[in-house]
Amino acid sequence: RLVNASGPTGGEVRLKDGGKHNSVGIIHCVGSRDINTNRYCSRLCCMASLKLAHLIKERTGAEVYNFYIDIRAAGKGYEEFYDKLLKEEVHFIRGRVAEVSDWTITADEEGKLLIRVEDTLIGVVRIIPVVMVVLAVGLEPSADADNIRRMFNISYSYEGWFLERHPKLAPVSTFTDGISLAGACQGPQDIPDSVAQAGAAAAEALALIDEGFVELVPNTAFVQDEFCS
C-alpha cells in the first residue's frame, strides 16, 4: 500500500517514523516451497515482488535487493520485465535468508536490519544491511474454506485447495453438479487466470440455465441389516 497513490503515504515509500530510506530487501517465498510450512509454489509472488522492486527503484532510487530461491517468471511479458529490472540495477541474490537481525557491528550498520544469506551462485555467506524488509508471503486457502467445502460437498487437496473434476478436461467443474470453481479457491492464481476461469465458470452456469431443468441422479441410501455388526 505504500507505493499506492491512494495509500496512507500518498505513494511515497517511508519508514515508520516518516523518514525516507535508501535500501530495501525483498525476501521471496516466505511460507512457500518449504516442507515446514507450505510445500507448493504460490506462483504470483515472484512477479508481485518484481513489480514492487521496480516501483521502489523508480520512485526513490533506493538500492533494492531481491533474495530468491528461483525466479519463476512464467507468463506473457514476465521474463522481459525481469530483464528490465536487471538493467535497472536491481540486485538479485539467490539463496534462502537465514536470519534478519538488528545486531549491528559497524557504525554504517547502525539503525539498519542485517539480512544474512548464502549466495548460492558464488558460494559465499553475505550480510546485507537494509533499512526496510519486505516479505513476499505465500498464499494459503481462506480460513472459512473448510466450511464452504462441507456445505457444497467439494473435494479438496492435501493443502486445502478445492479440487476440479479433471485438471485438463474439466478444469473449472467439480464432482458436485452445478458447482464450478474460479480464482484462488482452486489454488494460487494471478488476475488474468482468475478472469479466464471466471468466464469459463459463467459459461457452465449459463449452459445449465439454458436447459431449463437439472437432472438429479436418484440415488437413495439404505441399510442392509445382514452386513451390520
How would you name each of these model-derived features?
Residues 1-229:
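Residues forming the flavin
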